[in-house]
Swiss-Prot record:
It comes from Pseudoalteromonas translucida (strain TAC 125). The gene is rplN. Pfam families: Ribosomal_L14. Belongs to the universal ribosomal protein uL14 family. Keywords: Ribonucleoprotein, Ribosomal protein, RNA-binding, rRNA-binding. Part of the 50S ribosomal subunit. Forms a cluster with proteins L3 and L19. In the 70S ribosome, L14 and L19 interact and together make contacts with the 16S rRNA in bridges B5 and B8. This is Large ribosomal subunit protein uL14. The keyword rRNA-binding applies. One of its GO terms (molecular function) is structural constituent of ribosome. GO terms for biological process: translation. Disulfide bonds: none annotated. Gene3D superfamilies: Ribosomal protein L14. Binds to 23S rRNA. Forms part of two intersubunit bridges in the 70S ribosome. One of its GO terms (cellular component) is cytosolic large ribosomal subunit.
């Protein structure tokens, strides 16, 4: 469950290390984002010579949450941290590598690239 002001780790090699959610996209008064939802983020911490720099405002997709995701069979997939992958204006990932596992819920036509780059899909 990601909302405004939530700090997230970045699960790609775009150069950002920490981002903060500044808006949950999709609806005028939408409060929470779950895995697979697109949010607007501000880069709070970045490495030198990265593709993004501190203060940049980008779109991102949530790939891991502490809240987790409930599957139709009743199982719950949870993670130790909240993480996102930074996207460009065409909603494609900026980075060329994904770190850590992602869930099967990302496996739709929009985020197939993230699933294929991920080392593990749960």
């Amino acid at each position: 469950m990601i909302q405004m002001q939530t700090q997230l780790e970045v699960a790609d090699n775009s150069g950002a290390r920490k981002v903060q959610c500044i808006k949950v996209l999709g609806g005028s008064h939408r409060r929470y984002a779950a895995i697979g939802d697109i949010i607007k983020v501000s880069v709070k911490e970045a490495i030198p010579r990265g593709k993004v720099k501190k203060g940049d405002v980008k779109n991102a997709v949530v790939v891991r949450t502490k809240k987790g995701v409930r599957r139709p069979d009743g199982s719950l997939i949870r993670f130790d941290s909240n993480a996102a992958v930074i996207l460009n204006d065409n909603l494609q990932p900026i980075g060329t590598r994904i770190f850590g596992p992602v869930t099967r819920e990302l496996r739709n036509d929009k985020f197939m690239k993230i699933v294929s780059l991920a080392p593990e899909v749960l």
